[in-house]
Structures are given as structure tokens and as C-alpha cells.
Amino acid sequence: MIKKSAISLISYDAEYLADSIAKYYDFVDEIVLGLDKDRISWSNNSFKFDENKLWKDLKTLDVKNKIEVVEENFHPSKVAIENDNYERNFLKDKCTHDWIFSIDADEELVNAKHFFNNFVPLMETYYDKVDWMFTWLTPWKEIEDKTLVIANEDNSFHREAPQGFVTHKKNTFRYARWTNNTKQMLTPLVVLHWSLCRTEKNLKQKINNIGHSDIAKEDPFFQNWKHTDLKNWDQLKNFKTSGFGNNQWPKLVCVDTNSLRHIAESQLQLAY
């Protein structure tokens, strides 16, 4: 079996990172994490996180010494997406192995075991030819013991446009996780993306610091998010995405937070 390197990022999303890594830790051979040495984001804003907690959580998780933290200047440009690309390529080049799995801190793999044990072995012969994509499911907002999730008209969780996440080391990240490789393949991997489902303070921080922050800051979705509550959530229809293309989010569904992951798993057959 071809060895796998995973890369991820430490910044304002650090509180999600250990849980994210835990989903794929057993299935990759090394994990390279990037952290700006000055604690400056891609958008050239300073950030803080609970470093003691993260180091403790990673130490507990890393029973096989797979994790390496690389601290460098990851904000050489004034343009956020250029810094995004720079860091991902830097981490890729630090990897020991050629098969690169890029999974961000706020991404939680729903069906990691099936993906790595069943799908990957069947398709690894193409590891140096085709980039792989997964599908996002996007929780919108947690309120009390409920979570609002972006959904389709039939109430199934809405699947976002596929996202690139696996490539060969010879390729170059050109726009976030999209590379110069034009050959891409959708995989059955489904990922809960916690990009929006966070506190108002943390969401504002996300909007102002992500690689496409220049786009996200101009998008109206934050006001929609801010005013959504348990009384009006069902009134939000065909609302705007976070800055890319003309895609719309059809509606929301309200589920018990404790049932969210079970529901996501039950809908895996809809991944393609």
C-alpha cells in the first residue's frame, strides 16, 4: 500500500484540529501541520488560540509519533490566497511521502474508515495521475440542543460542490487545495464542514482570515446567519453561499445536535 502524508493548518481554527485529525490518524503515515511563527493569518491579522490545550491534545492523540509541527512565516504576501497557496505548497514539500491528503482543521471525516479501507486500496493505482475530491455537508448554526444544517428541498443534507483534497507531491497548489492537475475524481468521502457552525466571534474571525477573505467579507451570508434563530430558521430559502459562483443553499433543517452525525452517516449512499 502506498504511504500517505496528511497536511493541515494551525490557526484560529485550532480548537477543531485534534478532533479532525482523530478521524484519519490511523489511516495515514505522517501528519505535517503548519503554524505561522508570528501567529499572523493569511490575511495578515494576528490570531491566538489555546496553545497549551492543543499541544496537550496532540500529544495524547499522537501515540505513533506521526505528527510534525512546522513553524514558518506563512504570510509573505499581502494577498490572502497567495499565502494560502504558499503554506500548502510549503507543507507538501515537507512531506516524506508523495501521496498528499490535505484536510483542514474544521473538517470532520464522516466515513473515514470505509473510505480508507475500501475505496483507497481500489483506486491507489491512480494516485499520481488524478486529484481526488470529497463532498462537504455544512452545519449552519447550533442553538441550544439543536443544530441547523443546510439542506435540500427533500430535507436531506445539502452537498456542496466537490472540494479537492488529495494530490501527488509533484503537483502545485494553485488556489487553496486546487492544483495544476486538471484530472480530478469524486470519491465517496463525506466531510462535515464546521466553517459556519461556530460562535459569532469565531465566525467573524473566520470570514476575515480565510484564503478567500476578500470574497467572503462581501457576501451577505453572515447577516443571514446572525439573525437565524429557532423561530425563523424555516423562512430562510435559496440563500446565498459564501462567495463562490451562483450556487444557492435551498433551505435549512433542524436536527438534534446529538443526532447530527448519525443522520450524516445514514445519508452516505447519497454521496455520489
Which residue stretches match the model-derived regions?
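Short, well-formed alpha-helical segments that are part of the catalytic scaffolds
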Residues: D13-E51
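Catalytic-site signature of metal-activated, phosphate-bearing donor transferases
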Residues: S77-K92, S102-I103, E108-Y272
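Active-site-proximal specificity loops/subdomain of glycosyltransferases
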Residues: D36-W99
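Cell-envelope/extracellular polymer assembly enzymes that use nucleotide-activated donors
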Residues: K3-S5
